[in-house]
């Protein structure tokens, strides 16, 4: 098989949703169909003691939530599938947003009882901005939920995207009978306890059975007043195919997977900072780091840089250019993943996600190229923290572990580090409270370093050019600090303090992001 044929087999997508919509459950079922797990485990691990395959971090297993992005790969129906299971909790949106830069499509999981929720809307806006295809799975049909037509209407009104149902539910909750597959003209009957029946000549059964009268009326209405199916509109991100089903009972999931792989796009190109698009079928290797994760194997205190291959082929031992530093690096110890388990790989192609063992060489957003290519891909999104805490080691004898832990966890990008200019105290910045809790848990569990954390409340952060800096600018209304790149930054008590500073120093330029 040629390199181009291998690349065209790749399907790389993220699964997005509001917390508890069933995202991790559907991921489990997809892995089951891909032959990677023998059975899809019950995801509600915090009560049952069984854990999701994709939730590998200890705190994820304890709480039954996803707080990091997992990467999983399997072969199915002649395709190489790369799934990125993203954290649904809003505190981890920075990690999620970066992950969405590394995929070619998104699967949006919606709870049939709740419809479009806040986090789903936020994540959809990022996906929409990238113009990548969105496939919608409306979940939990085995429970009572909202009317299917209402859900489609909400999709279009709240998210502003046209929808096209690929199947249609017959009943819901206790009266759930199955799904009519509009795309394949097939009837799938639901019998509970993961027992199903599939009837190929669904049209004939529909026509002769009065039980399906309401469903027939809904379908006729959709055919008359609904949107037309267009594969191009799907690829352009203007039309979302909608699938109904129940991830927990594994009903409708395989039909979704089969149809998704039929219409999901091949790997696409990525823009450079100069506006050029790098073709995935180009011969030369290129890629970018979209995530760094410490302690995927706590026994070895390792760090993995996750790289999306944009073009060409990776071969073990190859040399690459790290554009940010202008230096070279050798990709010798490279892995691919099934959540926390991994295996060494000798080659991978555009569309694949690889993990490069990192000793501190890489940063999130780094571009890797070969030969004379020295371009950089467009920067990944960054977020300014709003909540702050002072942090110190509880035991002075554990300073080495404390500093090691802070260094590694900050480099992941899930939390940000600042150092008080005057006192040298460490301060952590986060988007949400859960990030602090996860930081504390991981410091104690992975680095054996207990920490003391003191809330500082909300702050307004602004960076300042070092040439403009005068330490006398620091006052009771602000804290002068350095970020982890030694750039000076002010943490203002509130917007009033920021305006006061701007009035007093009108010639000093303050930046929201560096």
UniProtKB/Swiss-Prot annotation:
GO-annotated molecular function: GTP binding; GTPase activity; translation release factor activity, codon nonspecific; translation release factor activity, codon specific
One GO cellular-component annotation of the UniProt record comes to: cytosol
- Give the matching SUPFAM superfamilies: EF-G C-terminal domain-like, P-loop containing nucleoside triphosphate hydrolases, Translation proteins
Residue positions annotated to bind GTP are 17-24, 85-89, 139-142
* Classification via InterPro entries: EF-G-like_DII, EFG_III/V, G_TR_CS, P-loop_NTPase, PrfC, RF3_C, RF3_dom_3_sf, RF3_GTP-bd
Compartmental location: Cytoplasm
A Pfam family it matches? GTP_EFTU
One GO biological-process annotation of the entry reads: regulation of translational termination
| Disulfide bridge map | none
Q: What is its main location?
A: cytoplasm
**What keywords were assigned to this record?**
Cytoplasm, GTP-binding, Nucleotide-binding, Protein biosynthesis
Q: Which residues form the tr-type G domain?
A: 8-268
Q: Does the keyword Nucleotide-binding apply?
A: yes
Give the function comment from the record. Increases the formation of ribosomal termination complexes and stimulates activities of RF-1 and RF-2. It binds guanine nucleotides and has strong preference for UGA stop codons. It may interact directly with the ribosome. The stimulation of RF-1 and RF-2 is significantly reduced by GTP and GDP, but not by GMP.
* Sequence similarity: Belongs to the TRAFAC class translation factor GTPase superfamily. Classic translation factor GTPase family. PrfC subfamily.
Q: What is this protein called?
A: Peptide chain release factor 3
Q: Which organism is it from?
A: Streptococcus agalactiae serotype V (strain ATCC BAA-611 / 2603 V/R)
Tell me the organism's taxonomic lineage.
Answer: Bacteria, Bacillati, Bacillota, Bacilli, Lactobacillales
